[in-house]
Amino acid sequence: KTRGVNVTIPHKQAVIPLMTRLEGRAQIYQSVNTIAVTPDGAVGYNTDADGFRHALQEGGAPLSGRVALLGCGGVGRTFACEAALAGCRIVNAVREADREMAAALRTFVQQLVPEVDYTIVSLDALQGEFDLLINATPVGMYPHTDASPVAAGVLAHTKAVFDAVYNPRETQLLQMAKAQGAAAIGGMAMLVWQAADAQTIWFGREFDPQAVAGVVEEALAEMERVFHG
């Protein structure tokens, strides 16, 4: 018997009309990545946000205070909304070509959290003190591993960095963060945690953080073997 399935781009919105109902973050974001088959029909969930929060928690980076969000694409919506729901002050740094998209994201977040403090700036103008910097761009992803979305100086007063990129294990951005003494968390942790949360929905099984950390390491080792020889 099928307990459920995972859904990915480009089907996260397309499956919604097939759902009996949406739960939690799936309802908020109108985006489904996990479907549970129940006696009452198909129920849509979104575990991307859960994976993100778990990754931050296990990496020692609280989602609080002043947050710099780089980019405003699909995964950026999840990060922006989670930061707003946590009461963070958001500085969204984007390319000039993405200003309109960033404004649309801000409007979406403001509808969810009307009182949110949300500023949009140019990526090359980002500066200041941040409790957390989140990279929601693909910059630094394999094979362009020598690239970073921001210069090292931007991280001088940043306490923690989360990079959604998971290949390579340690992006240029994360290397710079470590050099500045900041906590550095890669995207593989979010990927594995969202899968673990889907298993919890289907089977009711809770996962020990140490067990998940072990799976993260196994996934990173296999990725390095395949891509980096």
Language-model-derived ranges and their functions:
Residues K1-G60, E170:
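Phosphate/diphosphate ligand-binding glycine-rich loop within oxidoreductases
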Residues A14, A97-A104, P168-Q172:
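Short, charged/polar "capping" segments at the starts of alpha-helices
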Residues G44-A49, L56, G60, G65-A84:
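Glycine-rich adenosine-cofactor-binding loop
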Residues L85-I90, Q180-A183:
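Conserved S-adenosyl-L-methionine
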Residues C88-L112:
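NAD(P)-binding Rossmann-fold cofactor-contacting core
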Residues L112-I185:
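Rossmann-like adenosine-cofactor binding region
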Residues A160, A164-G229:
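Adenosine-phosphate binding glycine-rich loop
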